Amino acid sequence: MNTLKQYECTVIIDGGLQDDAIAAVMELVKKTVTDKGGVINNVLEVGRRKMAYLIRKTSIGYYAHIEFDAVPSVIAEIERVFRYEEAILRFLIIQLSSPLLEMRKRVEKYSVMLGSPEDQAEAEADADAKN
């Protein structure tokens, strides 16, 4: 069965690298996902952050979060490529299940309602339109 499933990947890149080296690693990450047949939905580059503990004697990491769709059989191949890239300190790929997706929708709905008055009015109008 070759149906696409939704995944999230969080990557921590060595924060001591130059900006162009970090950009090259991010391109490698994106290229790896797309070359293996994945479709990238969203990329959030959080930036450099101090890590809670040292990883390979490094205290600063560049955090990135990628959401993509892929066939489950290629996840092991993507992980293998990430594992061999020295600039990637840590990574985690999880499959988004239905409960996680539903919870995300609820969080987005209520976070908009807690925002500005304009956002709150828009969210209430959307809720009324659904009912």
UniProtKB/Swiss-Prot annotation:
Keyword list (alphabetical) reads: Ribonucleoprotein, Ribosomal protein, RNA-binding, rRNA-binding
The protein's matches in NCBIfam families, at most eight in alphabetical order, are given as:
S6
GO CC annotation, single: cytoplasm
Q: What is this protein called?
A: Small ribosomal subunit protein bS6
Write down the Pfam families for this protein, in alphabetical order.
Ribosomal_S6
Q: Name one GO biological process term.
A: translation
- Which pairs are disulfide-linked? none
